[in-house]
Amino acid sequence: MKFTESEKLHQEALEHIVGGVNSPSRSYKAVGGGSPVAMEKGEGAYFWDVDGNRYIDYLAAYGPIITGHAHPHITKAITKAAESGVLYGTPTKHEVTFAKMLKEAMPALDKVRFVNSGTEAVMTTIRVARAYTGRTKIIKFAGCYHGHSDLVLVAAGSGPSTLGTPDSAGVPKSIANEVITVPFNDIDSYKEALDRWGDEVAAVLVEPIVGNFGIVEPKDGFLQQVNDLTHEKGALVIYDEVITAFRFMYGGAQDLLQVKPDLTALGKIIGGGLPIGAYGGKKEIMEQVAPLGPAYQAGTMAGNPASILSGIACLEVLKQDGVYERLDQLGAMLEEGILAHAKKHQVDITVNRLKGALTVYFTKETIVNYEQAENTDGEMFARFFKLMLSQGINLAPSKYEAWFLTIAHTEKDISETLQAVDRAFEQLKQS
């Protein structure tokens, strides 16, 4: 494959856009550098770049594009919105329809509020939890990403259940001191944190199924134990379902795992590809939000008709029979093939898969927490990524990210992908 136009475009972008990208995850820094491929068109399971190369896409825009690119039902809804005016600054009937759909999907949502991104949704759930409890500290799990607000750009401290340290320049230490970071799937460390700071904790922020250091499921009983211990201390449980909602099951991870949070943050899939976020939860907690309560949150673009209509259309597609069974079937086919080729070429990998999403780790170890994911072979992944890209398979350029299947993928796409995996593993072993 030739990437001449992508390389030219990246050089031009560097002159005008910071780092040449509008999100650092789009750069190729984590896979050894180089010019990121610039895409020009998406349709179904495929991308075409500015050089005319075609790719089978497993990035899915980091998760939102579960229906495939340019799904006709969603495209029709967006066109309708464009023709009717994309922004009013007033209530609309569509936002009521969409709120009802989210509540029907997730019974933990008594009340809902729309925002513009997953970052906003998480940020606001924390504010609401603090308003409701009168406390300030938050517990999060190491390696879990909850957006780029100061409140959650916090890394683990010097050991389990410690106060965090800023994970970005510009985040004050005073903010990091309000965040306690513990290892995921480690209930003893969680108990230790609550024993030490429980009376100061407003909420625990949880990815019920981790999606940001790969796909990592909670151990049996872990989430329920977290719920029970948190409530014993008078704190709230916030589920960050920005990735997981409507990805593994229509009702989200909380339905799949049969656990119920106090507050939920949503994003990605619920916009059908357009910018959106939402948060919701128990009525008495959500009534802390203005104009009913003292916790302020607002947004010019919040609930805009384009994103709302796109989201409604997306959920209408996902509510059809057999969607999640189909994603699981394709995911199993992909996982089995990857493992078979790894065994054939004696390449050490572990695959974590849940239905239509999976992560390939270059390690023999079973991954259940961030420390293990961090210790996987990033150099080997970088080589694998570039070998796959050169064969027309588009993956996320990071060892921590998932492969996301869409309902547009076919068995033929999986077979073509596995042929590329076979050749990539062969070259990795030879070199």
UniProtKB/Swiss-Prot annotation:
A GO cellular component term found in this entry reads:
cytoplasm
Listed under catalytic activity are:
(S)-4-amino-5-oxopentanoate = 5-aminolevulinate
Could you give a GO molecular-function term held by this entry?
transaminase activity
Its annotated pathway reads: Porphyrin-containing compound metabolism; protoporphyrin-IX biosynthesis; 5-aminolevulinate from L-glutamyl-tRNA(Glu): step 2/2
Q: Which domain of life is it from?
A: Bacteria
One GO term of the biological process aspect:
protoporphyrinogen IX biosynthetic process
Q: What is its main location?
A: cytoplasm
List localization entries.
Cytoplasm
Could you tell me the keywords of this UniProt record? Cytoplasm, Isomerase, Porphyrin biosynthesis, Pyridoxal phosphate
Cofactor(s) needed for function: pyridoxal 5'-phosphate
The first-level EC class reads isomerase
Q: Do the record's keywords include Aminoacyl-tRNA synthetase?
A: no
- Give all cystine bridges in this chain: none
What Enzyme Commission number(s) does the record list for this chain?
5.4.3.8
Residues where N6-(pyridoxal phosphate)lysine occurs?
Answer: K268
Per UniProt, subunit arrangement is:
Homodimer.
Stored NCBIfam families: hemL (TIGR00713), PRK00062.1 (NF000818), PRK12389.1 (NF009055)
Family classification: Belongs to the class-III pyridoxal-phosphate-dependent aminotransferase family. HemL subfamily.
Protein name (database record): Glutamate-1-semialdehyde 2,1-aminomutase 1
Q: Which organism is it from?
A: Bacillus pumilus (strain SAFR-032)
